[in-house]
Amino acid sequence: MGLMDIHNAVCSLVIGVAILIATSQATFVDWGSSITSMGDFWESTCSAVGVSIAFSSGFSVLFYMGLVAVISALLAGSYHACFRLFTADMFKEEW
């Protein structure tokens, strides 16, 4: 299987998924009615109330710890890659 065959298969798959999404979304749109005719658009029970930072739940603490770990890993990886590039360039130089 050549590279062109894989490219054509991926393109066909992407186009098929796009057509499927476009046709499924078109069935949910009601073009004849407006928002005011559907009733009250805003519901007080669905509005966001925010997250308390001072008294946060265990899940949010774990989420932020994971976020810090991911950011630290990305920074360490980028520093390591940059350090390797500079040292490789430095050892190529002839004195």
From Swiss-Prot:
Q: Which GO terms describe its cellular component?
A: host cell Golgi apparatus; host cell membrane; membrane; viral envelope; virion membrane
Q: Where is the signal peptide?
A: 1-26
**What topology does the record note for this protein and the membrane?**
Single-pass type I membrane protein
InterPro entries cross-referenced by the UniProt entry: GN_domain (IPR008647), HSV_GN (IPR034707)
Q: Which residues cross the membrane?
A: 56-76
Q: What does this protein do?
A: Envelope glycoprotein necessary for proper maturation of gM and modulation of its membrane fusion activity. Also plays a critical role in virion morphogenesis.
UniProt protein name: Envelope glycoprotein N
Which source organism?
A: Gallid herpesvirus 2 (strain Chicken/Md5/ATCC VR-987) (GaHV-2)
